[in-house]
UniProtKB/Swiss-Prot annotation:
Pfam families: MatB. Keywords: Fimbrium, Signal. It comes from the Bacteria. Belongs to the EcpA/MatB fimbrillin family. It is found in: Fimbrium. One of its GO terms (cellular component) is pilus. Part of the ecpRABCDE operon, which encodes the E.coli common pilus (ECP). ECP plays a dual role in early-stage biofilm development and host cell recognition. Major subunit of the fimbria. Self-associates. Forms filaments. Interacts with EcpD. This is Common pilus major fimbrillin subunit EcpA. Residues 1-22 form the signal peptide. Induction: Positively regulated by EcpR. The gene is ecpA. It comes from Klebsiella pneumoniae subsp. pneumoniae (strain ATCC 700721 / MGH 78578).
Length: 195
């Protein structure tokens, strides 16, 4: 009888040790959304981004994902207009790492296969040259009607270059420092009504 009690006590002691040695592992992440609110229904041209951009590094491809960034365009019609042109131009596209490394990433912007550059305008609509704007064609059809016309389309955004410290370019994104980059990607839209 004493042997059974001793054996049960030993088994209980060993079982208790196994439980005591196991440690809980937890991880936590915080998601942050920047938020603003704006309403403008009177300007001649209003462009509203529909969402935000978040690039994630993928180890398997040693690169960052690309994203479709949708936007809404609203214009006020001009009944005296005989032609309409809408262009876009890249203004800012640098993301900077939020530490002391100075590492940067450059975001490329593409519209229907054409790069949107800082050095020139990308034509989105030009009714005089029969460029009707694809998904923005409602604007090409409504620019000379009374009232407002809206349409939605999107850019493709991707990371096109990076630096480890603000000056030293990288060809292999796996060599970038760990961390988070932040910044703005701004595109200027210009609309011209010709009378």
């Amino acid at each position: 009888m004493k042997k059974k009690v001793l054996a049960i006590a030993l088994v209980t002691a060993f079982t208790g040790m196994g439980v005591a040695q196991a440690a809980d592992v937890t991880a936590q992440a915080v998601a942050t959304w920047s938020a603003t609110a704006k309403k403008d229904t009177t300007s001649k041209l209003v462009v509203t981004p529909l969402g935000s951009l978040a690039f994630q590094y993928a180890e398997g491809i040693k690169g960052f994902n690309s994203q479709k960034g949708l936007f809404d365009v609203a214009i006020e019609g001009d009944t005296t207009a005989t032609a309409f042109k809408l262009t876009s131009r890249l203004i800012t596209n640098t993301l900077t790492q939020l530490d002391t490394s100075g590492s940067t990433l450059s975001v490329g912007v593409d519209y229907n296969g054409a790069a949107v550059e800082k050095t020139g305008d990308t034509v989105m609509i030009d009714t005089a040259n029969n460029i009707m704007g694809g998904n923005l064609s409602a604007l090409a059809n409504g620019y000379n009607a009374s009232g407002r016309t809206t349409a939605q389309d999107g850019f493709t955004f991707s990371i096109i270059s990076g630096t480890t410290n603000g000056t030293t370019a990288v060809t292999d994104y796996s060599t970038l420092p760990e961390g988070i980059w932040s910044g703005d990607v701004s595109v200027q839209f210009d609309a011209t009504w010709t009378s």
